[in-house]
């Protein structure tokens, strides 16, 4: 069974990378571009990719730094998925619109501790990070394989004011409000913290489903409470596999193997209009290939005029298995 999840991001503007990086900006060049632009070219994040499968990325907000937590089976040489951490660097030239990006694996005390908290001898997939402004805590969501081989949603929390020490006291907890006897994974939450979306295969194929959240200030009680009323998002699902939703503003991007696509799994997007998600649109040949595109995640940077999309693909240009890729996207254009 192919499994794959989210990204919650806001970063800073022009990242001028030093210390051995080739990404740099000369101070004596005039500013011809007031805002940065993420190019629509597809970039392989080869510094953090491997010969195995790398997908399910999550990116937190850290000014000047962009650590990415994602799922990879590299540590077990392909037998199981763990959460691992990489790092990306990018820079946009305000002089000539040049763009460069570099990536590497990331060794950091906090992220190492977080990996140790969540990784087991089973699969861990779909990391997703969220700051809850109602209670001041950051949430780390993911899916873990249970004893029956199905995926269950879990989470833990820590304080952004003291992330390392508060993480030491945290332990993963099952999300009883959403878990079922089927596979439950790839969670994401809307901007208003009112609706949670995730993937479930209770009807045979994978569907994108949703549930209404109670009071966001007591989110923990809701997550660990009685089963919530879960409903299928009819307007985006098909009779095939629809999974890995990610929301940003009024856009949902997900993956599907429905007929009429370009390859196996393609990336699609839906627009929220008049209280309903639109019929999905294929993201087209600039992103999709005859192979599989998986687990889309949308990010942004202040002072950049567009967003960036990170996704996984097993296209032959990669290092092997599924690799992570980055490209620029215009959400306003998609919403038209």
Task: Label each PLM-derived region with a short phrase.
Residues 25-336:
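Short, conserved micro-motifs composed of acidic
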Residues 1-31:
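Bacterial Sec-dependent N-terminal signal peptides
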């Amino acid at each position: 069974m192919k499994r794959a999840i989210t990204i919650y991001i806001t970063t800073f503007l022009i990242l001028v990378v030093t210390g051995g990086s080739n990404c740099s900006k000369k101070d004596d060049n005039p500013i011809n571009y007031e805002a940065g632009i993420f190019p629509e070219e597809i970039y392989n994040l080869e510094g953090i990719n491997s010969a195995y499968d790398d997908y399910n990325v999550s990116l937190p907000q850290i000014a000047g730094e962009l650590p990415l937590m994602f799922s990879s089976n590299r540590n077990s040489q392909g037998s199981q998925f763990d959460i691992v951490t990489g790092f990306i660097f990018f820079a946009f030239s305000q002089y000539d619109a040049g763009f460069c990006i570099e990536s590497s694996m990331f060794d950091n005390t906090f992220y190492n501790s977080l990996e140790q908290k969540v990784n087991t001898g089973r699969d861990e997939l779909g990391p997703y990070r969220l700051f809850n402004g109602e209670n001041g805590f950051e949430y780390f969501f993911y899916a873990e394989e249970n004893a029956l081989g199905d995926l269950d949603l879990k989470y833990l929390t820590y304080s952004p004011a003291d992330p390392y020490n508060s993480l030491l006291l945290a332990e993963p907890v099952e999300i009883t409000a959403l878990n079922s006897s089927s596979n439950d994974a790839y969670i994401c939450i809307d901007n208003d913290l009112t609706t949670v979306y995730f993937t479930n295969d209770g009807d045979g194929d994978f569907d994108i489903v949703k549930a209404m959240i109670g009071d966001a200030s007591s989110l923990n009680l809701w997550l660990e409470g009685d089963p919530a009323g879960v409903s299928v998002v009819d307007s985006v699902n098909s009779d095939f596999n629809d999974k890995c939703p990610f929301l940003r503003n009024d856009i949902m991007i997900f993956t599907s193997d429905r007929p009429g696509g370009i390859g196996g799994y393609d990336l699609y997007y839906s627009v929220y209009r008049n209280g309903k998600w639109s019929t999905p649109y294929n993201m087209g040949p600039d992103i999709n290939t005859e192979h599989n595109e998986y687990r889309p995640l949308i990010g942004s940077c202040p002072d950049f005029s567009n967003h960036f999309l990170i996704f996984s693909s097993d296209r032959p240009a990669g290092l092997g298995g599924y690799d992570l890729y980055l490209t620029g996207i215009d959400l306003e254009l998609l919403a038209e």
